[in-house]
């Protein structure tokens, strides 16, 4: 999980979602997981 100021899609499988008020990226590739911190 990468914590970043700006999250963005890295590949086509990445999806932007909101969880508990945080913007997150979930993907089939675990390296692409990000959350906004």
From Swiss-Prot:
Q: Name one GO molecular function term.
A: structural constituent of ribosome
Q: Which UniProt keywords apply?
A: Chloroplast, Plastid, Ribonucleoprotein, Ribosomal protein
Q: Which PROSITE patterns match?
A: RIBOSOMAL_L36 (PS00828)
What SUPFAM superfamilies does this protein map onto?
Ribosomal protein L36
Matches recorded under InterPro entries: Ribosomal_bL36, Ribosomal_bL36_sp
Q: GO terms for CC?
A: chloroplast; ribonucleoprotein complex; ribosome
Keyword Transport on this protein?
Answer: no
Q: Where in the cell is it found?
A: Plastid, Chloroplast
* Disulphide connectivity of cysteines: none
Alphabetically, which GO biological process terms does the record hold?
A: translation
Superkingdom in the source lineage: Eukaryota
Zinc-finger found in the keyword field? no
Q: Which family does it belong to?
A: Belongs to the bacterial ribosomal protein bL36 family.
NCBIfam families per the record?
Answer: rpmJ_bact (TIGR01022)
Q: What is this protein called?
A: Large ribosomal subunit protein bL36c
What is the native source organism of this protein? Spirogyra maxima (Green alga)
Q: What is the lineage of its organism?
A: Eukaryota, Viridiplantae, Streptophyta, Zygnematophyceae, Zygnematophycidae
